[in-house]
Amino acid sequence: IMMVNEICEKKYNKPLSGCTNEEIYYALLDMTKDLAAKKESEAGKKKVYYISAEFLIGKLLSNNLINLGLYKTVKKELEAAGKDIGEIEEIEPEPSLGNGGLGRLAACFLDSMATLNLHGDGVGLNYHMGLFKQVFDHNFQKETPNPWIEKDSWLIKTNVSYPVSFGDLTVTSRMYDIEVTGYEGRTNKLHLFDVDTLDESLIKDGTISFDKTDIAKNLTLFLYPDDSDENGRLLRIYQQYFMVSAGAQLILDECIAKGCNLHDLADYAVIQINDTHPTMVIPELIRLLVERGLDMDEAIEVVSKTCAYTNHTILAEALEKWPVYYLKKVVPQLMPIIEVLDDKVRRKYEDESVSIIDRNDTVHMAHIDIHYGFSVNGVASLHTEILKETELNNFYKIYPEKFNNKTNGITFRRWLLHCNPALTELLDELIGEGYKKDAAELEKLLAFKDDEKVLDRLVEIKHANKEALCKYLEETQGVKVSPDTIFDIQIKRLHEYKRQQLNALYLSLIH
């Protein structure tokens, strides 16, 4: 492996010690991308396509170096040249491709599939400005764009592009890839679709306001654009269809290249629909299969064996639904298919609450997923039980075999190996390194639960971490805090319906 000094000599014609932190960051970016690409390989004929409106992947440099087994080596080489890997990591902008638990779940599954050597790629959109950057000015929130794409980034521009037709215009998608490294595993891909016609100058200076009607120029500017008006709501449908249409065309191309005859699509692909944003992939795939010669009934059967749905919403009334006239305007080609899907459900089940189009002419996206997919999962056991017992009980009675639970843990390679090296060292010493690939191995720690020496070391490690946090708070916030403080830390944007609100009220009460 060519190490950092050699890369700096080659790229900048000077040694590592003479490079700026920025130069070293870009050298490491090149090196990591090259090494990750070498771990790609076709693995068997079947592949998972994980379609999601968001992927909260976090900064990638440290994560990729850990997964490639290079973090310690690179850190030592940088230290020998008088450089600090922590300062270099700070230079990397965080990809603005996700927001919350839904996006983190997607990123965790990609990480996990690559680590388990499973063939599974992500499919999403290449947002340029993310959700928004939150700043407070005189106690009021100001939203500003959150750009992250630079000339050199983790994005790899491909030659893959597909036409995507809406009711009133056709755009051409362009696919960008980000490599997803597994821990000592394979490299998969996150496919992100974009448009070459995007125009960032549509955004009004320092705000997140823009012309929501110019679809060819605004399509991938923001994640979840403001939907408080009709143009914003329509834009969300444009975004969703753009993602699934380009994604469906990619999936069919890849499967056909492996020998799929379309009748056997389910032997080549499984499509995981992460929440309801990608639901239109179901009617879109049916449309494409019919266009390519399958009859409608068979196309529906094939797609139903290929798609699965992850539910994130506990309340039935909060599930995504769109007026028929919105869909007729944006994706008129899908409405006849959605009507056929609804008709099939109505013929089979008298219960109106499970139909797809209700009497107010509203299309219920989750209902498409449940009827025309082979699996419905919740994301925590209590959540799944509530879905089965109350919120989706009508569907559970029809399809008990479809409902299952998938609880997501944490990606401990980031939150333990990288964030807490001292604790990692202690664990290695106590139980070996198997836990780095199999979290169940952490149960071996129970043998030490009464070991005073081990418990003392845990307290020491925790205290040292609190001292580091106090130093950071003093440097960045100008606040001096005692390391004996109890810290309750929440690292999301401040939000009006999250636990932070309760915390703020509680603090104002006790102080």
PLM regions: where:
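A conserved ligand/cofactor-binding region detector
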Residues: 1-510
